[in-house]
Amino acid sequence: MATFVSELEAAKKNLSEALGDNVKQYWANLKLWFKQKISKEEFDLEAHRLLTQDNVHSHNDFLLAILTRCQILVSTPEGAGSLPWTGGSAAKPGKPKGKKKLSSVRQKFDHRFQPQNPLSGAQQFVAKEPQGDDDLKLCSHTMMLPTRGQLEGRMIVTAYEHGLDNVTEEAVSAVVYAVENHLKDILTSVVSRRKAYRVRDGHFKYAFGSNVTPQPYLKNSVVAYNNLVEGPPAFSAPCANQSPASQPHPDDAEQQAAFLLACSGDTLPASLPPVNMYDLFEALQVHREVIPTHTVYALNIERIIMKLWHPNHEELQQDKVHRQRLAAKEGLLLC
């Protein structure tokens, strides 16, 4: 890993020296490409414009170093991440086209005007295989958590924007754990609004969706749940001044479970539909502490509101007519 870090720093230094005063514009273009606001071809074109012909290789070396560092570069076709290197033997672009025009003029009149298919000049559609730049998609596109390599690459770009030279492994690990815990808090807030749960130590929520629910019309029900005694976690170690916590006796635990079952309701809660955007919207409105930053909270609330949808009366009527037509074809009758 130290070799990759040294190679990345050396490639960044060489690229900065080659860019000179255009280094800020290059970092801005790199950020836009990483956010998928510009394509790889546009980024290469801008880099080719900022660099001289002799320094184009520094751009390629830097991209190779940063992709190797993030372990994103797995198998790319030859030349996919490089700019075209023409060197000193570049041919003049106007000669071949000029020859074609002269030869076409010398053709006979009968061969000049021939019916031509307009689609023949269109670019042939080729299905793009999921490789190369597909690994750079945002997690909002893939619907999956960002990988460690993607987070490290994003942090490297952000560090370069703020004048930092490198990102440590400890910082990447901290961001990975922070993302996981943040999503767990959001899921906990959503599930706690839909299902009953128990609380340990006054704040730790557990046993979501338990079938044993308290009966609010029984006085003993509240007492039973408030006086619930459970064993400590298996990994808890006693302190120096504390005695080790003892596990509850099996007979006492069995009596306690029977008492809770007797004090619970006689009907099970109805099954709920899958979690939708309305559940997420309500959970974020009730638990504002899940997203403490007001800017991020307001932006996500706007996105959720834009995706809220429910059928209106016309759509429901059209759906009913459609179902009746399908039933008529099958020889059935819908009421």
UniProtKB/Swiss-Prot annotation:
It comes from the Eukaryota. GO terms for biological process: positive regulation of DNA-templated transcription; regulation of DNA repair; regulation of RNA splicing. Keywords: Nucleus, Transcription, Transcription regulation. GO terms for molecular function: transcription coactivator activity. It holds the Pfam family SAGA-Tad1. Transmembrane segments: none annotated. Probably involved in transcriptional regulation. Belongs to the TADA1 family. This is Transcriptional adapter 1. The lineage of its organism: Eukaryota, Metazoa, Chordata, Craniata, Vertebrata.
